[in-house]
Amino acid sequence: MGLLLTALLQTAERFSVHLYEKRRDYTRTRMVQVASYLVADSVASYCTDYIDEESVQAVFDPQEITAGLAFRQSIPPDLMARLRGWAQGFCPLNAIERSLSDLIDARQSHPVRRSVAAVTAEDAMAMLAPGDILIDCTGSNSLLRDQLVPGAGAVDGSPNTFKIRLEYALVVTFLYGQAYDCNESCKYYKNIENAHYKFIPAVNRTYYDGSISHVTGIVSITAEDYERMPSRFDGHWLRSHFPHVAESMDRFIAKVKEETNGEIIGDLEIIRIPLDLYRARHATSREWRRTGTGDHPFIRSPVFLVGDSAMGSPYFQSISLGFECAMFLAGLLVQRDLPLPDMLDRYELYAYKQWLRVYMRSKMIKHNKDLLECVGDTVA
């Protein structure tokens, strides 16, 4: 997220951007997808998602969506071309990171200062000078999220984090060597023989080849199963230690192969995770400006949370949500005549509306998933 924000702000004459990265080698290979609404050119094409189309229309005014689309038109062509390419299908995360990093370095007329350092919250506060703007893109374990509430240091827990644990699950990912689609009916019929564990897939093409499909399957597990599993493993380990869980996965794969005569490319990648839905109650340092005392740096300099630092959902990859928040924030920052209090208010409202969208979408996906998991259960 920090790379995208840097690329968005880099060409703005009023900013001198300093990007801090924990590391410069991009090793995260998991497949992600940039949603098509990020490159939409009309309100109609923006509101095309079959799950949250109505939610978007209920939460956001048409004028808000139109303003976001207008900012997209100002995004430099070199960056927009990349976004359109990634929106074609799933892409390795580190390929996106490397592409953005190379783009930043290639813009010789607008150099960015880059530092590799493990920055702490105390470091971030100490380096803030009057006139600086600090943007936290450090992810779900945000560096500054719980520092945005005055007095948070004296409070146990996470005072600025609201979290709902929906369930525990296995997330199974693999590439399949044929174009494939799986709607709700497909998910239903492919799980009829699975008595307990259901394999609920999401399928889409890869961005580089429309004939290769990326499959992400979620299998709900118990808290006891979760504790007995390592954090990451492969299909062989699952079949050896949890054969009943593996059966649901293997049945799905076998039926897909039977229909299309394709094969899995490479290995299965499986992780076990708690599926948490969360948000920051305050997405900026506005509360410090309202109620803070003394000479705290967050009173002098604004702080914003972007991406997973601000909110996250387990059922769909949050890179698109983070990218959209980054675009909205960049659009605010380039407005020279926008007073800082108004900027903070507008970003807080936007973050809350995005949270409503995320919450409703996540609950709908969970509802649909729970219904599919009742397949074959004559008691439910």
PLM segments and residue spans:
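A conserved short coil-to-beta-strand element within the FAD-binding core of flavoproteins
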Residues: 110-129
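Glycine-rich loop(s) and the adjacent beta-strand/alpha-helix scaffold that form part
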Residues: 148-186
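FAD-binding beta-loop-beta segment adjacent to the flavin cofactor pocket
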Residues: 271-316, 338-341
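Conserved FAD/dinucleotide-binding core of flavoprotein oxidoreductases
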Residues: 185-288
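Active-site-adjacent segment of FAD-dependent monooxygenases/related oxidoreductases
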Residues: 15-18, 22-109, 362, 366, ...
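C-terminal helical "tail/cap" subdomain of flavin- and related membrane-associated enzymes
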Residues: 43, 316, 331-380
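N-terminal Rossmann-like FAD-binding beta1-loop-alpha1 element of flavoenzymes
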Residues: 1-20
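Flavin (primarily FAD) binding-site architecture
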Residues: 134-157, 226-235
